[in-house]
Amino acid sequence: MDIKLKDFEGPLDLLLHLVSKYEVDIYDVPIVEVIEQYLAYIATLQAMRLEVAGEYMLMASQLMLIKSRNLLPKVVESTPIEDDPEMELLSQLEEYRRFKVLSEELANQHQERAKYFSKPKQEVIFEDAILLHDKSVMDLFLTFSQMMSQKQKELSNSQTVIEKEDYRIEDMMIVIERHFNLKKKTTLQEVFADCQTKSEMITLFLAMLELIKLHQITVEQDSNFSQVILRKEEK
Protein backbone atom coordinates (compact mmCIF):
# COMPACT_ATOMS: atom_id res chain seq x y z
CA MET A 1 0.00 0.00 0.00
CA ASP A 2 1.35 3.43 -0.94
CA ILE A 3 0.74 5.99 1.82
CA LYS A 4 1.62 9.58 0.93
CA LEU A 5 1.50 12.47 3.39
CA LYS A 6 1.35 15.98 1.98
CA ASP A 7 4.57 17.76 2.86
CA PHE A 8 4.75 21.25 4.29
CA GLU A 9 6.06 24.06 2.10
CA GLY A 10 9.30 24.08 4.06
CA PRO A 11 10.75 23.85 7.58
CA LEU A 12 9.39 27.29 8.55
CA ASP A 13 5.91 26.20 7.44
CA LEU A 14 6.15 23.12 9.68
CA LEU A 15 7.41 25.18 12.62
CA LEU A 16 4.64 27.75 12.15
CA HIS A 17 2.08 24.94 12.16
CA LEU A 18 3.48 23.63 15.46
CA VAL A 19 3.67 27.12 17.00
CA SER A 20 0.10 28.00 15.98
CA LYS A 21 -1.27 25.19 18.16
CA TYR A 22 -0.27 27.10 21.30
CA GLU A 23 -2.48 30.07 20.29
CA VAL A 24 -0.09 32.61 21.81
CA ASP A 25 2.29 35.22 20.44
CA ILE A 26 5.21 33.65 18.56
CA TYR A 27 7.68 35.13 21.05
CA ASP A 28 5.84 33.50 23.97
CA VAL A 29 5.79 29.88 22.76
CA PRO A 30 7.66 27.21 24.79
CA ILE A 31 10.43 26.91 22.23
CA VAL A 32 11.97 23.68 23.63
CA GLU A 33 8.59 21.90 23.35
CA VAL A 34 8.20 23.06 19.75
CA ILE A 35 11.74 21.92 18.91
CA GLU A 36 11.10 18.47 20.41
CA GLN A 37 7.92 18.12 18.31
CA TYR A 38 9.82 19.13 15.15
CA LEU A 39 12.64 16.65 15.84
CA ALA A 40 10.12 13.89 16.61
CA TYR A 41 8.42 14.57 13.26
CA ILE A 42 11.74 14.29 11.37
CA ALA A 43 12.74 11.14 13.28
CA THR A 44 9.41 9.49 12.46
CA LEU A 45 9.76 10.31 8.75
CA GLN A 46 13.19 8.67 8.81
CA ALA A 47 11.88 5.63 10.72
CA MET A 48 9.19 5.20 8.06
CA ARG A 49 11.92 5.48 5.42
CA LEU A 50 10.30 8.54 3.86
CA GLU A 51 12.54 11.04 2.11
CA VAL A 52 13.45 14.09 4.19
CA ALA A 53 14.56 17.19 2.26
CA GLY A 54 17.94 18.66 3.13
CA GLU A 55 16.44 21.97 4.27
CA TYR A 56 14.51 20.14 7.00
CA MET A 57 17.69 18.46 8.24
CA LEU A 58 19.54 21.79 8.23
CA MET A 59 16.79 23.34 10.33
CA ALA A 60 16.89 20.31 12.65
CA SER A 61 20.59 20.90 13.36
CA GLN A 62 19.92 24.58 14.08
CA LEU A 63 17.06 23.66 16.42
CA MET A 64 19.23 21.17 18.30
CA LEU A 65 21.73 23.98 18.91
CA ILE A 66 18.98 26.27 20.22
CA LYS A 67 17.61 23.49 22.43
CA SER A 68 21.02 22.70 23.92
CA ARG A 69 21.58 26.39 24.70
CA ASN A 70 18.17 26.59 26.38
CA LEU A 71 18.94 23.59 28.57
CA LEU A 72 22.27 25.00 29.78
CA PRO A 73 22.35 26.95 33.08
CA LYS A 74 21.53 30.60 32.51
CA VAL A 75 24.50 32.95 32.87
CA VAL A 76 24.05 36.68 33.39
CA GLU A 77 25.99 38.49 30.67
CA SER A 78 27.50 41.92 31.30
CA THR A 79 26.84 42.83 27.66
CA PRO A 80 23.92 41.71 25.50
CA ILE A 81 24.54 38.86 23.06
CA GLU A 82 24.24 40.12 19.51
CA ASP A 83 23.96 36.70 17.87
CA ASP A 84 20.93 34.96 19.43
CA PRO A 85 19.82 32.03 17.21
CA GLU A 86 16.53 31.65 19.09
CA MET A 87 15.44 35.27 18.59
CA GLU A 88 16.61 35.12 14.97
CA LEU A 89 14.47 32.02 14.39
CA LEU A 90 11.40 33.58 16.04
CA SER A 91 11.86 36.72 13.92
CA GLN A 92 12.00 34.56 10.78
CA LEU A 93 8.82 32.78 11.88
CA GLU A 94 7.02 36.07 12.50
CA GLU A 95 8.10 37.38 9.09
CA TYR A 96 7.04 34.12 7.42
CA ARG A 97 3.66 34.26 9.22
CA ARG A 98 3.00 37.81 7.94
CA PHE A 99 4.02 36.78 4.44
CA LYS A 100 1.73 33.74 4.53
CA VAL A 101 -1.24 35.77 5.80
CA LEU A 102 -0.67 38.33 3.04
CA SER A 103 -0.41 35.57 0.41
CA GLU A 104 -3.70 34.04 1.58
CA GLU A 105 -5.42 37.44 1.48
CA LEU A 106 -4.18 38.06 -2.07
CA ALA A 107 -5.32 34.57 -3.12
CA ASN A 108 -8.79 35.20 -1.65
CA GLN A 109 -9.03 38.55 -3.45
CA HIS A 110 -8.02 36.88 -6.70
CA GLN A 111 -10.73 34.23 -6.27
CA GLU A 112 -13.35 36.90 -5.51
CA ARG A 113 -12.44 38.84 -8.67
CA ALA A 114 -12.49 35.62 -10.69
CA LYS A 115 -16.17 35.14 -9.78
CA TYR A 116 -17.07 38.29 -11.70
CA PHE A 117 -14.70 38.12 -14.65
CA SER A 118 -14.39 34.44 -15.44
CA LYS A 119 -15.85 31.07 -14.65
CA PRO A 120 -13.96 29.53 -11.70
CA LYS A 121 -11.97 26.45 -12.59
CA GLN A 122 -13.02 23.14 -11.03
CA GLU A 123 -9.37 22.31 -10.31
CA VAL A 124 -9.09 25.11 -7.75
CA ILE A 125 -11.97 23.72 -5.67
CA PHE A 126 -10.50 20.23 -5.92
CA GLU A 127 -7.07 21.40 -4.72
CA ASP A 128 -8.61 23.21 -1.73
CA ALA A 129 -10.42 20.02 -0.72
CA ILE A 130 -7.17 18.05 -0.88
CA LEU A 131 -5.35 20.62 1.25
CA LEU A 132 -8.02 20.46 3.94
CA HIS A 133 -7.96 16.65 3.98
CA ASP A 134 -4.18 16.42 4.07
CA LYS A 135 -3.96 18.97 6.86
CA SER A 136 -6.03 16.74 9.16
CA VAL A 137 -3.86 13.75 8.27
CA MET A 138 -0.73 15.80 8.97
CA ASP A 139 -2.06 16.76 12.41
CA LEU A 140 -2.60 13.06 13.12
CA PHE A 141 0.91 12.28 11.88
CA LEU A 142 2.43 14.97 14.12
CA THR A 143 0.61 13.54 17.14
CA PHE A 144 1.77 10.04 16.21
CA SER A 145 5.39 11.20 15.87
CA GLN A 146 5.32 12.61 19.42
CA MET A 147 3.84 9.35 20.75
CA MET A 148 6.47 7.33 18.90
CA SER A 149 9.26 9.49 20.34
CA GLN A 150 7.92 8.93 23.86
CA LYS A 151 7.46 5.19 23.26
CA GLN A 152 11.06 4.85 22.06
CA LYS A 153 12.26 6.46 25.29
CA GLU A 154 10.20 3.96 27.30
CA LEU A 155 11.50 1.00 25.28
CA SER A 156 15.11 2.13 25.65
CA ASN A 157 14.70 2.02 29.43
CA SER A 158 13.19 -1.47 29.39
CA GLN A 159 14.56 -4.88 28.43
CA THR A 160 15.91 -5.36 24.91
CA VAL A 161 13.17 -6.18 22.43
CA ILE A 162 13.93 -8.05 19.20
CA GLU A 163 12.39 -6.25 16.23
CA LYS A 164 9.92 -8.30 14.23
CA GLU A 165 9.87 -7.43 10.53
CA ASP A 166 6.74 -9.23 9.33
CA TYR A 167 3.99 -6.99 10.70
CA ARG A 168 1.18 -6.75 8.15
CA ILE A 169 -1.12 -3.77 7.65
CA GLU A 170 -4.09 -6.11 7.14
CA ASP A 171 -3.46 -7.75 10.54
CA MET A 172 -3.10 -4.39 12.25
CA MET A 173 -6.41 -3.22 10.77
CA ILE A 174 -8.03 -6.15 12.60
CA VAL A 175 -6.22 -5.18 15.81
CA ILE A 176 -7.63 -1.65 15.59
CA GLU A 177 -11.14 -2.89 14.80
CA ARG A 178 -11.09 -5.06 17.95
CA HIS A 179 -11.00 -1.87 20.01
CA PHE A 180 -14.54 -1.17 18.76
CA ASN A 181 -16.04 -4.57 19.66
CA LEU A 182 -17.62 -3.26 22.87
CA LYS A 183 -17.54 0.50 22.30
CA LYS A 184 -17.92 3.01 19.49
CA LYS A 185 -14.84 5.09 20.25
CA THR A 186 -11.33 4.80 21.68
CA THR A 187 -8.26 6.99 22.09
CA LEU A 188 -5.08 7.04 20.06
CA GLN A 189 -3.13 6.30 23.25
CA GLU A 190 -5.18 3.14 23.90
CA VAL A 191 -4.57 1.84 20.39
CA PHE A 192 -0.78 2.17 20.70
CA ALA A 193 -0.55 1.22 24.40
CA ASP A 194 0.54 -2.40 23.81
CA CYS A 195 3.09 -1.72 21.04
CA GLN A 196 6.53 -3.13 21.85
CA THR A 197 8.59 -2.14 18.82
CA LYS A 198 9.03 0.71 16.37
CA SER A 199 8.01 -1.49 13.43
CA GLU A 200 4.79 -2.43 15.19
CA MET A 201 3.89 1.23 15.82
CA ILE A 202 4.57 2.26 12.22
CA THR A 203 2.53 -0.62 10.77
CA LEU A 204 -0.32 0.13 13.18
CA PHE A 205 -0.30 3.79 12.11
CA LEU A 206 -0.41 2.84 8.42
CA ALA A 207 -3.34 0.51 9.18
CA MET A 208 -5.11 3.42 10.86
CA LEU A 209 -4.63 5.61 7.78
CA GLU A 210 -6.06 2.83 5.62
CA LEU A 211 -9.17 2.55 7.84
CA ILE A 212 -9.63 6.33 7.62
CA LYS A 213 -9.25 6.14 3.85
CA LEU A 214 -11.92 3.40 3.72
CA HIS A 215 -14.25 5.56 5.88
CA GLN A 216 -14.39 2.86 8.56
CA ILE A 217 -13.13 5.14 11.34
CA THR A 218 -12.96 8.89 11.89
CA VAL A 219 -10.51 10.97 13.90
CA GLU A 220 -11.59 13.75 16.28
CA GLN A 221 -9.78 16.18 18.56
CA ASP A 222 -11.71 18.71 20.65
CA SER A 223 -8.82 21.16 20.99
CA ASN A 224 -5.08 21.45 20.42
CA PHE A 225 -3.10 19.01 22.61
CA SER A 226 -6.26 17.21 23.76
CA GLN A 227 -6.66 13.44 23.34
CA VAL A 228 -7.17 12.17 19.80
CA ILE A 229 -10.38 10.13 19.57
CA LEU A 230 -10.98 7.35 17.05
CA ARG A 231 -14.64 6.70 16.32
CA LYS A 232 -16.22 3.79 14.44
CA GLU A 233 -18.14 4.98 11.38
CA GLU A 234 -21.86 4.26 11.46
CA LYS A 235 -22.96 2.03 8.59
UniProtKB/Swiss-Prot annotation:
Source organism, top-level taxon: Bacteria
Keyword Cytoplasm: yes
Biological processes annotated in GO: cell division; chromosome segregation; DNA replication
Known function: Participates in chromosomal partition during cell division. May act via the formation of a condensin-like complex containing Smc and ScpB that pull DNA away from mid-cell into both cell halves.
Family the entry assigns: Belongs to the ScpA family.
HAMAP family: ScpA
Protein name listed in UniProt: Segregation and condensation protein A
Organism whose genome encodes this protein: Streptococcus agalactiae serotype III (strain NEM316)
Recorded name of the encoding gene: scpA
